[in-house]
């Protein structure tokens, strides 16, 4: 406990009060960045697709005891509401998830903890074990291909949802992926809509859904085994926070520039194959879709977006450029909007240089990240996947893969205009010196800087993105930004 403020360099400082017995308050000092051991264990477990709750409840530290007391009391109260308030635990779980934005309801949490462990928690807190917990059986279990819920009468009854609602995190319990690894899975969807079958669904499920080589292996694989349509979707709080920065820090520390180039090339090849797959491809995100996460969506035919979605390319904040087709796709979108390669380059440059994001689909539309004449929004997150499946069915009959575009580089005169803009900003204190380096590197991807190549292809833009990324990765300032983001949660300004 204590008071916090941000000091020089963006470091968090704290005035520690816990255990202070004197009259004079101690001075501010740099806050401890270390997380409690059980929080670290829980984060590691979550990243490994294991149950994190088990980790925060084990041990005799004051953190673990606090977690046991709080969870014990909250979950005990929830269990006591059966059957007084409802016969079905699902009703309470749904109320907490829909009404209070819980990721899992209390009865789902009790299943995750284990009912015998729950009994220990309640006894430790001096609480009576509710009747519904006396029977050591899970509240949710799979019966054949159906998910069922244990009611107050101890009988298992079908897990029920309103018509048109699909919660994939629940439905996936009854499904077996045809391909999976630690970061993503590939599922076949059948029977979710009349006449729409043999679909493929790609689900990311790494920590924060950060994209890795393993994630992109599944994206590449679905382009080969595409069925009758592809949906990119998951039910996590955030669709994807972008590419795993830890991987890039490791590459930089080893000076493995070929490794960075190979990683980016694999990413680009995966999204390029996705774009030209001979079946409809729909992205159905909710929450944050940033950086590489948005680059995957940018190569889809159409987006069905939850209204509470944030989209954008934020790479410049950590000193790099979008390296998975993000510059290329944004440049194309702005050209289709403005019909001018110079205007397209300027608008793309402003988007990426400011690391702009749209905090709603409407605001994303101003950045051309959400295309109002093509993409759709869905207000109820539970109906996102249903709408995506329906749209696949509507697109199937007359679908043909997009034609590969011919691009042009913007004229060299624009580069000088951009340089003057950045230099003025640096002199005024609006930008830091490395902001200009990053911005001009972004500009160099889209501008014919040598006056030799006016026309371009997607592959040329992909190559320029990789070169620009590696050029910046070799700078000390970019390494400092990436390290600051990973170590302190915000990039240093330099």
Please tell me what each predicted stretch does.
Residues 241-243:
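Extended, composition-driven regions rather than compact fold-specific motifs
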Residues 1-230, 235-237, 246-279, 286-289, ...:
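N-terminal glycine-rich phosphate-binding loop for ADP-containing cofactors
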């Amino acid at each position: 406990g204590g008071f916090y403020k941000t000091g020089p360099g963006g470091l968090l400082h704290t005035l520690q009060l816990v255990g202070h017995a004197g009259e004079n308050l101690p001075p501010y000092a740099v806050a401890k960045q270390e997380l409690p051991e059980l929080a670290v264990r829980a984060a590691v477990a979550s990243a490994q697709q294991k149950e994190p709750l088990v980790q925060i409840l084990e041990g005799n530290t004051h953190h673990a005891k606090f977690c046991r007391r709080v969870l014990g009391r909250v979950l005990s109260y929830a269990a006591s509401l059966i059957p007084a308030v409802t016969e079905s635990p699902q009703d309470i779980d749904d109320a907490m998830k829909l009404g209070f934005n819980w990721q899992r309801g209390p009865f789902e949490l009790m299943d995750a903890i284990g009912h015998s462990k729950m009994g220990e928690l309640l006894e430790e807190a001096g609480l009576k074990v509710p009747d519904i917990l006396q029977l050591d059986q899970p509240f949710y279990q799979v019966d054949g291909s159906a998910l069922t819920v244990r009611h107050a009468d101890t009988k298992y009854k079908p897990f029920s949802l309103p018509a048109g609602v699909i919660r994939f995190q629940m439905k996936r319990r009854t499904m077996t992926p045809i391909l999976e690894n630690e970061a993503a899975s590939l599922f076949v969807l059948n029977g979710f809509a009349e006449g729409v079958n043999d679909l493929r669904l790609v689900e990311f499920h790494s920590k924060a859904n950060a994209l890795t080589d393993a994630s992109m292996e599944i994206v590449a694989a679905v382009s080969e085994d595409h069925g009758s349509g592809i949906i990119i979707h998951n039910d996590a709080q955030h669709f994807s926070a972008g590419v795993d920065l830890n991987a890039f820090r490791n590459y930089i520390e080893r000076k493995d520039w070929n490794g960075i180039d190979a990683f980016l090339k694999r990413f680009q090849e995966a999204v390029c194959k996705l774009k030209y797959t001979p079946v409809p491809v729909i992205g159905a995100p909710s929450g944050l879709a940033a950086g590489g996460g948005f680059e995957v969506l940018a190569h889809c035919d159409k987006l069905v977006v939850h209204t509470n979605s944030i989209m954008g390319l934020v790479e410049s904040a950590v000193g790099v450029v979008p390296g998975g087709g993000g510059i290329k796709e944004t440049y194309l979108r702005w050209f289709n909007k403005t019909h001018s390669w110079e205007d397209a380059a300027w608008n793309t440059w402003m988007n990426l240089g400011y690391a702009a994001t749209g905090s709603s689909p409407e605001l994303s539309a101003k950045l051309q990240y959400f295309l109002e004449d093509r993409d759709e929004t869905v207000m109820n997150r539970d109906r996102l996947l249903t709408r995506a499946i329906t749209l696949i069915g509507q697109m199937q009959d007359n679908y043909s893969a997009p034609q590969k575009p011919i691009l042009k580089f913007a004229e060299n005169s624009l580069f000088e205009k951009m340089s003057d803009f950045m230099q003025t900003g640096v002199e005024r204190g609006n930008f830091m010196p490395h902001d200009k380096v990053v911005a001009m590197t972004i500009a160099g991807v889209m501008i014919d800087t040598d006056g030799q190549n006016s026309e371009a292809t997607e592959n040329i833009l992909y190559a320029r993105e990789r070169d620009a990324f590696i050029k910046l990765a070799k700078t000390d300032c970019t390494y400092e930004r990436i390290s600051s983001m990973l170590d302190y949660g915000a990039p240093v300004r330099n």
